Amino acid sequence: LFFGLTKKRFYSFKRVVLDKNIGPIVKTVMTRCIHCTRCVRFAAEIAGVEDIGMFGRGLHSEIGTYIEKVFQSELSGNVIDLCPVGALTSKPYPFVNRNWELKNLTFIDFSDGFGTPVQLFLKNNQVIKILPGYEKATYKTNWISDKTRFSFDGMFSPERIIYSFLNNNQKESFLNLS
């Protein structure tokens, strides 16, 4: 080698934490975790479930679920957006596309009655992901449910039923809804 050091400067052991299965939505890469406890505080204060906590002290501290429990909440996908270092990522769609490849579109959430603003990210006119939007008047980010975050997968599925059928005396016919 012509440039740089030929031997390591870091001789201590590196901290290795095994990844945990905390549910079907959130994937963990716990070696990235910096113990900011944003996910713990979000689960307790906003989602209302105390499924995630910090265990141990000092160098041996870890964030995980109690007794290998699953983090189940309607708002559990929001910890993906809260994590500053990417220790908590989306399990159904991890690193599918780069953000600069996607077209951003502001929209209103159709799955709840609150009119929550969401951001749709499109590629080739197909929805790739849905993230919470913010209100322009207050610049406040909203929380979205897991149903909102992942509902586009079923909406644009080729197996989705598009037409209604009416079954009269063993004879099926199209039902006009207009």
Question: What are the residue ranges of the model-derived segments?
Answer:
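N-terminal export/assembly segments and adjacent metallocofactor-ligating motifs
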Residues: 1-178
